């Protein structure tokens, strides 16, 4: 009993400390991805590959989901300056890549 209670506590703590990206059905065709925890740590621009905004009314928080070069998704607060700077950098990077012949 003590072992299962300790394991449950450990799992709850681990879940609270990790960045969670959960998918909930918005409609039959397209799912909505929501962020429930936002990172407080700045992510190096070199580690970022892309991003998408989370603005669905079905989600509790407005967020930006960055995808890293290692294909990891990280939720961030779009009001933070580093997040805005990173999105601008990725936008500029994608424009220069699509402009090349």
UniProtKB/Swiss-Prot annotation:
The keyword Phosphoprotein does not apply. It is found in: Secreted. InterPro entries: Chemokine_b/g/d (IPR039809), Chemokine_CC_CS (IPR000827), Chemokine_IL8-like_dom (IPR001811), Interleukin_8-like_sf (IPR036048). Processing at the N-terminus can regulate receptor and target cell selectivity. Deletion of the N-terminal residue converts it from an activator of basophil to an eosinophil chemoattractant. N-Glycosylated. Pfam families: IL8. Induction: By TNF-alpha. GO terms for cellular component: extracellular space. One of its GO terms (biological process) is sensory perception of pain. SUPFAM superfamilies: Interleukin 8-like chemokines. Keywords: Chemotaxis, Cytokine, Disulfide bond, Inflammatory response, Pyrrolidone carboxylic acid, Secreted, Signal. Endothelium of small veins and intrafascicular veins, and infiltrating leukocytes. Disulfide bonds join 34-59, 35-75. The modification Pyrrolidone carboxylic acid is found at residue 24. One of its GO terms (molecular function) is CCR chemokine receptor binding. Residues 1-23 form the signal peptide. Monomer or homodimer; in equilibrium. Is tethered on endothelial cells by glycosaminoglycan (GAG) side chains of proteoglycans. Interacts with TNFAIP6 (via Link domain). Belongs to the intercrine beta (chemokine CC) family. Acts as a ligand for C-C chemokine receptor CCR2. Signals through binding and activation of CCR2 and induces a strong chemotactic response and mobilization of intracellular calcium ions. Exhibits a chemotactic activity for monocytes and basophils but not neutrophils or eosinophils. Plays an important role in mediating peripheral nerve injury-induced neuropathic pain. Increases NMDA-mediated synaptic transmission in both dopamine D1 and D2 receptor-containing neurons, which may be caused by MAPK/ERK-dependent phosphorylation of GRIN2B/NMDAR2B. This is C-C motif chemokine 2. It comes from Canis lupus familiaris (Dog). The gene is CCL2.
